[in-house]
């Protein structure tokens, strides 16, 4: 397989790297680009890794993941969503992106179709191209109010569709599917004999008070055709650990384990034991963190909407603010370049999340209130 030209540089990393170089050169830059939680990894995770290393748990482990962690994940989702998974239906991976990539690599064949609902996480098209370069990608855009056009999705999916790739809670838009939308996506997939749903739910815990995340795990009729991917980067700030997982039927999990065996061998053994500690402790940091995010998001929303160029809606989850820039008369890359050059604020162009969204940009508000106020002060001067 040649390295396909369809693999593109992620614009959030591009702008973040540019900002890092400018900071090294002594320039005062405020980066609201990368989605990284501004909290510390729980001490019990670090202690669990250290303990595992002292006990000699530093060697090869099962390519599917250590049994204790797989069993704990299965029990956790069963308790939350009322589903019925076992450890044999769980696959541990070095991050959510690899978890998705493993599934795509094991499912896709040349000329298969994948339908992506946009705005989408920026790595999806490249992940698909790497897994199977001859895949036909179809994009179904959300409506302007971020609701799903069920009729358009139904029209896009056919018997050639191998996967419908979805992300709710959504990065970059901070929106979530309704119960009806989740059920409708399942019904559409089940109309066709070989169509899977790959659901990225890594922001499932970062939901604001009064809002409800509807997981595909709750839809029991889709279980055999569902790949649910998740991880610990957002819920436990473990971005640098690279640790994620997927839930799928046993047959597919076995294929993914074989794929991992012949590529990565296994996900880091001591890190898996650190993650195991997550399921032995209460997740009592989540509620106050979400309250803090909502407070910061409300501040940012109220302030940035005073600017004539920017109009956004208050998100329901996560730490991204999705803002319309049509009033500026410019496209997303141009606006992001000018924000950086003129006032030293870094954002991510909307076009990287789907072609329809070139009149949007994304800000990450996973920074302190002081940093956000500094950013707003600068953005107020931007013209």
Model-derived features: where do they sit?
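PLP-dependent class I/II
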Residues: 2, 6-10, 22-30, 36-52, ...
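A short, well-ordered alpha-helical element
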Residues: 11-19
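Generic structural signal for well-ordered alpha-helical scaffold segments
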Residues: 20, 74, 78, 104-105
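A glycine-/small-polar-enriched, mobile loop at the entrance of the PLP active site in fold-type I
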Residues: 31-38, 51-70
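Conserved N-terminal alpha-helix of the aminotransferase class I/II PLP-enzyme fold
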Residues: 60-93
């Amino acid at each position: 397989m040649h390295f396909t030209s369809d693999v593109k540089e992620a614009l959030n990393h591009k702008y973040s790297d540019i900002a890092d170089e400018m900071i090294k050169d002594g320039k005062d830059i405020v980066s609201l680009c990368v989605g990284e939680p501004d909290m510390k990894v729980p001490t019990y995770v670090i202690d669990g890794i250290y303990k595992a290393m002292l006990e000699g748990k530093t060697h090869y482990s099962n390519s599917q993941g250590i049994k204790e962690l797989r069993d704990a994940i299965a029990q956790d989702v069963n308790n939350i969503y009322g589903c019925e998974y076992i450890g044999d239906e769980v696959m541990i991976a070095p991050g959510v992106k690899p978890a998705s990539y493993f599934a795509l690599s094991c499912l896709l064949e040349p000329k298969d179709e994948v339908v992506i609902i946009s705005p989408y996480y920026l790595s999806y098209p490249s992940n698909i191209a790497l897994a199977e370069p001859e895949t036909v990608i179809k994009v179904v855009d959300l409506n302007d109010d971020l609701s799903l056009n069920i009729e358009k999705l139904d029209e896009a999916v056919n018997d050639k569709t191998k996967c419908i790739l979805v992300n709710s809670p959504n990065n970059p838009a901070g929106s979530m599917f309704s119960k009806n939308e989740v059920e409708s996506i399942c019904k559409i997939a089940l109309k066709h004999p070989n169509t899977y749903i790959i659901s990225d739910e890594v922001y499932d815990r970062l939901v604001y008070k009064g809002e409800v995340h509807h997981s595909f795990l709750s839809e029991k009729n889709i279980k055999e055709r569902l790949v649910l991917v998740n991880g610990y980067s957002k819920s436990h700030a473990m971005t640098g650990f690279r640790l994620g997982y997927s839930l799928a039927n046993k047959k597919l999990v076995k294929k993914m384990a074989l794929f991992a065996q012949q590529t990565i061998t296994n996900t880091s053994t001591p890190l898996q034991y650190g993650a195991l500690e997550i399921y032995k402790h209460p997740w009592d940091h989540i509620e106050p963190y979400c309250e803090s995010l909502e407070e910061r998001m409300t501040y940012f929303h109220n302030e940035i909407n005073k600017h004539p160029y920017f109009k956004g809606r208050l998100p329901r989850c996560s730490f991204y603010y999705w803002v319309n820039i049509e009033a500026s008369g410019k496209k997303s890359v141009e606006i992001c370049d000018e924000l950086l050059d003129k006032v030293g604020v870094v954002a991510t162009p909307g076009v990287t999340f789907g072609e329809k969204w070139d009149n949007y940009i994304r800000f990450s508000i996973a920074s302190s209130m002081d940093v956000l106020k500094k950013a707003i002060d600068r953005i107020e001067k931007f013209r």
